[in-house]
Amino acid sequence: VARKLGVDTVVGFTGSSIWPYLAMFPPVPASVIEAGFDDFATRWNPILDVFDGEGVRFAHEVHPGEIAYDYWSSVRALDAIDHREAFGFNWDPSHMMWQNIDPVGFIVDFADRIYHVDCKDTRMRPHNGRAGVLGSHLPWGDPRRGWDFVSTGHGDVPWEDSFRALDAIGYAGPISIEWEDAGMDRLHGAPQALAYVRSLLWPVPTASFDAAFSNQTTGDTA
């Protein structure tokens, strides 16, 4: 369907048979975790065969509940499928922030696997150590939470550094805004978020910024 629609990248989730073992207690044998990544490869290699056949890429969103949910699980997921080119990542920094993962470093280290970009923001609210990162079974927007999703540009994601990193790796794919904010009306927040993201999409230079000085120096000494 994606190919018929002219779409070359599909964003989605993989699922995970080992997510219930996240807490690692009771102790989980390493073999169980390894079997989980093997299960991922067994299920997804045939799917990726179809993607390859259609010339379409799959951009997995690094997200809790999935086989690749943070930095090292992303490394391991790629290893499990022998780094197939059909499989890459949807870079969504909102889920990295509350896990204390550097979203800019993720771009740099997975430069050839950033297939899609989701602009979604997170604001951290540690509350002097009262709230943890797992949400405390509190609903979105509850001020007691340790973090929450907010309109893009209103949180703690280092957006300028992130877009500079995307420019540096030559990213030219889709950029979408995934808007969530329990404390802001979407008809106000979504257009504001769009304007904010557009303000970061400046043209990259075609030459070194000091090239003009070099030319001037050359001209003076000619």
Give the residues covered by each predicted segment.
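Active-site acidic/histidine proton-transfer and metal-coordination neighborhood
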Residues: 1-89, 220
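Conserved, mostly hydrophobic/aromatic
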Residues: 2, 10, 40, 58, ...
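Active-site beta-loop-alpha junctions enriched in small/polar residues
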Residues: 15-17, 61-65, 92-96, 120-124, ...
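Gly/Pro-rich active-site loop or hairpin
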Residues: 71-75, 79, 97-171, 184-188
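Primarily recognizes the serine-hydrolase "nucleophile elbow" in alpha/beta-hydrolase
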Residues: 89-90, 109
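C-terminal helical cap(s) of enzyme catalytic domains, especially alpha/beta-barrels
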Residues: 186-207, 213
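Short, highly charged C-terminal tails/helix-capping segments
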Residues: 212-219
